Structure formats: C-alpha cells, structure tokens
C-alpha cells in the first residue's frame, strides 16, 4: 500500500497556475497610462433587466494608445452604458458620438502611478499567498502519506517537488509584478 501513495503534482500545478491567471486578470484591470479593452471588462450595464458585461452590449476597441471606444449595438443602451462607465470608478469621462462611446485615457501623474504600483504589489502578494496555500495543501498530502506508511525517501522527493513548483510559481508572480510596475511607471 505504501508504494501506491502519490501526490497529485498536476493538480497542485493547475491550482498555482490558476492563482497566476487570476493575478494576470487583476493586472489587466489596473489602469495604466495606456488604453486597454480589459479596463472596461469589470463594468456591468443594466441591460434588458439584468446586469451584463459591457462587451456583451457593444464592441470594445482600442483605436489609439490613449482611447477606448465602445460601439453599442442597441441605440437605446448608449445612455445606460455611459452611466455605468461613469459610476464604475474608472475615473474616465465618456464622450458619446451616436452609438459610439469614446473613453479618452488621461495621463497618470506620478503620485497615482506610485499608488498603482502599490496596488499591483498587493495583487501579487495575494497571488503568492494563494500559491503558498496550495503548497501547504501539497505538504499536508505528504504528511498524510507519511502517516499511511510512505517511505522517507518518497516523502523527501515529494516535498522537494512541491517546493520547486512553489518557487517556480512565486518567481513567475515576481516577474509579472516587475513587468507591471515597469509598465505603470512608464511615462
């Protein structure tokens, strides 16, 4: 029975990648000085009696580095989309031209850039904590295996494998954070 004990590294790796994917999504929603279609993804619009993501009521484009446009499909929804953007907390003042809503992205000042780098660091720390929690789950599996008769050599092997996976994932988080902070601070 002791030989049958295995730790599911694939599951641990999948969960760590999930934390990384979540971090990338959070980073994408951070407003840098550059326009991005993902900036408006979290914005919900009341459409046809229910809350709907903006990308389901119109086409989101980035025609210029500092401009996001939303081509609303239903003319009657333009006002609601504009209102949702104003109330979203993005700090962007929409301009309407027929069914097209233009979102000019203002230049960020130095103070705001520093605040955003701190927010990015918080997001990265949340991802690190999630990865460490996955590591802890893996180590708990190893402890259960030890209690069920796992040989000490196997235990050391799995502990090393889980730790290497954790180190690699946290390294990826750190790289993503450095890249995002550089992007935010870029004038």
Swiss-Prot record:
Principal localization reads cytoplasm
Record-level GO BP terms = cytoplasmic translational termination
Tell me which InterPro entries the record gives: Ribosome_recyc_fac, Ribosome_recyc_fac_dom, RRF_sf
Q: Which UniProt keywords apply?
A: Cytoplasm, Protein biosynthesis
Q: Which Gene3D superfamilies match?
A: 3.30.1360.40, Ribosome-recycling factor
Q: Mind listing the GO molecular function terms for this protein?
A: ribosomal large subunit binding
Metal-binding: present as a keyword of the record? no
The subcellular localization recorded is:
Cytoplasm
Q: Which domain of life is it from?
A: Bacteria
Presence of keyword Protein biosynthesis: yes
User: Per the record, what is one GO cellular component?
Assistant: cytosol
What does this chain do? Responsible for the release of ribosomes from messenger RNA at the termination of protein biosynthesis. May increase the efficiency of translation by recycling ribosomes from one round of translation to another.
Q: Which family does it belong to?
A: Belongs to the RRF family.
Q: Which protein is depicted?
A: Ribosome-recycling factor
